[in-house]
Amino acid sequence: MLIEDAVSSGTPQFVIDSYATLADRAKTQSFGLIEEDVIVLDTETTGLSVQDNELIEISAARLSGREVIDRFDTFVHPKQLIPAEITELTSITNADVADAPSAVEAVAALADFVGGCPVIAHNATFDRSFIESVKGGVNVSDIWIDSLALSRIALPRLASHKLSFMADLFGCDSVSHRANADVDALCGVWRVLLVALTDLPQGLMARLADMHPDVPWSYRPIFSFLAGQNPGSIFSLSAARADVLKADRADDRVDADELPVLKMPSREEIEADYAPGGLVNRMYPTYEPRDEQIAMALEVHDALVTGTHRVIEAGTGVGKSMAYLVPFAEAARRNNITVGIATKSNNLADQLMYHELPKLAEQLNGGLSFCALKGYDHYPCLRKLERMSRGQVEITTKRDPADTLTAVAVIMAYVCQSADGDLDSLGIRWRSVNRPDFTTASRECARRLCPFSLINVWSTVLAVVRRMPMWWSPTIPCCSVTSRPRAGFCLRFVIG
């Protein structure tokens, strides 16, 4: 898999170039103490619920630098039979676990192997909950590092942070839904993550390591060690934002009002896009032409050509999204303009963003960029993010405050590598994090008094004609998101 195909749409080229060299650098770069005597662990269970299911396999590896110096592997005898679907997934049978140690015996042996060293697991909350549900499990380790959350900090632009996806991308051992194979894969991915963290802006590791030092946080020692490799580096959020926006800058779009007429495909070309073997069929191999969808697409086409309006009512199963996306995309590409689409819900916007539009852009062979624009509370306020990262505000969550620090780190990393995007795509546990600590509302936005206002305005002027800004508290009224049209700018979704 190519890096270009593994990152989210709109990833800056400098980020792609950095990701492309990670696997090679991970083979030679050393990280001293933070990769000595660490345990990589994975488990297999009879299901997902710690209340209703049990351990059936535990695997762990002790790392010293780039080498595995010791292994721990055991089946676990459950009190219940292994469900057929689990056997199908893992290939672990009831015969395999018939003579295995009990959960208490297996976890006690694991505790002896780990010896209190830090434990790395992908989605560590899952593995830890099963281990600690067993008597003596809390003695395994006090330090659990979730490589899933760490991957979102280290590699914020990846399209997926599944272990299997990253292992395949970076040439690590493959994942097979067996604990020992998954441990082998994670051993390789772990070093890639450490290298990727060093590619984040200088000073960011120190900023993260120094956040709210009173809060126990398993990632703090990692960030502190990496910060020590560049002592004295100062992190600037405004400078990081300026760099990523500059790298993302492209030629301005044409103002549609300045065009005497839109260049559009003919009605026959639009019909051909929906015919067998046409554009839509290439996007969806099982697609079958629908007369209602073609009729709707032609109405949208005619409205664009004539500069008139249409109100179209279409039932379920017509394929409305593709009926309007194809003519709009052709209008945007052929005229170098930005087209706005107002969806009824953010869920529909996400469906277009992550499903239809990537497929459409691929079949159009480039020339189509797209991004989503939602309401205020879907985007981070840079001013609040800066204050939170400096420890200038209290953590207000009633749950584990470490989750808030992890959210700060994830958002910070994403901001430094992304010109646009929204909070919903970052995998943050909002049940444990107070979202208003990171977002703003119209009544509280500092606007021109905001220390990031110059960045916001620069990004906005660029974005209005090319793509919508994602990381700003809107300061230009015509770009505000509303639930009903206002001055012609009810923009929930933008392609261009």
Model regions: which residues?
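Conserved pre-motif I regulatory segment
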Residues: P265-I312
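Conserved non-catalytic scaffold segment of RNase H-like nuclease domains
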Residues: G10-W144, P156-H177
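Acidic, Mg2+-coordinating catalytic module of metal-dependent nucleases/exonucleases
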Residues: G115-K135, P156-L158, K162-Q229
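Walker A/P-loop
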Residues: V305-P327
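SF2 helicase catalytic motif II
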Residues: C478, R492-G496
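A substrate-engagement module of RecA-like helicase motors
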Residues: A256, I270-G278, N336, T343-M470
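Acidic two-metal-ion nuclease catalytic site recognized across multiple nuclease folds
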Residues: L2-S30, V192-R267, E271
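Conserved two-lobed SF2 helicase motor
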Residues: P469-V481
